[in-house]
């Protein structure tokens, strides 16, 4: 599935709720899902990890839509490797 297709599907499915909730509320829901992913890491259950990553991806699409950001355009920043050094793999110094 392309990012634009995902964003469109999520917008059609949840867009009215997302707009009613607003950017702040939608972002907070996404952060909750990040917490659920952290719990899934502790359990090391692949199916649970996959589920939570999918939820975060869906919420990120919602946040992007409410903020007026196109996911395809945002992802383009990484299309040719590291946006800082321009290399694949990244050769930036590790902080």
Residue ranges of each PLM-predicted region?
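Flexible "arm" and connector segments at domain edges
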Residues: 1-53, 57-95
